[in-house]
Amino acid sequence: MVRTIVCDLDGSLMNPSSGIYVNEAVKEALIEVEKKNILVILNSARCFQGVYPLSKQILMQDFGCNGAHCLDVKMKKTMFEYVISNNDVSSIWQYAQKHNLGVGYSQPGYFVANKMTHGFELDMHNCDVDYILTNHMEKYLKDSVWKMSISDSKENIDLIYDSMKDHIESNCNVKVVHSTDTMIDIIHKDCEKLNSVNRLLKNLEISWKDVSSIGDGSSDASVLEASGLGVTLENGCEACKKVAKKIVPSCYEDGCIEWLKEL
């Protein structure tokens, strides 16, 4: 019996980079699932601002989780978080500045960056998050940092990625992830989707066998494999298709609805 569903967003519940809300048909299907007393967990690499509006759209009353920050939506209370230290934020900022790269860090109400790039512009619109541009990194560093990003052209990112990853991971307590062609995401080294969901399920005393999950990216594969019913889409990566117990039509066809209606 499925007690909980774990949902990736971009490429699963919605088309990649398509804004902060799901299509109306997907919204209604998710609400019907919630009416069956099935717990919904949103498990996205997006920053908080790109996930929270969706939780309100689908009338979520329980938990939202983007890996680095797990929020009880009903109580508006942080359950746990994986925080990048201020020293590491400063070190990464200085490294990016030295190499003339765009760099920024998350805050609960905004994102702070040294300059606007194409990648940051896409993120600003996709997550509906306000960007503050500054040369003074420490001025706006008021709360926990759950994610940093480095952004530049695809050519520059491809050129510097390997050496940048080695340098940053060797000197800071973080993990460097090639997120998109123009964006590098940086998170705490212990933060990943599987670890975060596992930690949440233990808190809630829910077994993985009672979980159904959906995802399309490589970071989703371990979650699908651990779940009682792991589902991917036709647009899913090979790693997801290898471990999924069910494959539904692509996100461009709202394939997740087939899965939601069968729960």
Please state what every model-predicted region is.
Residues 22-120:
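Active-site phosphate-binding/coordination module
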Residues 33, 44, 148, 197, ...:
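Residue-level signal for inorganic ion chemistry
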Residues 1-7, 35, 206:
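Non-catalytic pre-domain segments flanking phosphatase-related domains
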Residues 95, 99-102, 106-214, 218-226, ...:
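Conserved acidic, metal-coordinating active-site core of Asp-based
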Residues 3-19, 224:
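Asp-based phosphoryl-transfer active-site loop
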Residues 57-58, 66, 172, 226-227, ...:
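Short, structured coil segments at secondary-structure junctions
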Residues 226, 234-263:
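Asp-based, Mg2+/Mn2+-dependent phosphohydrolase catalytic module
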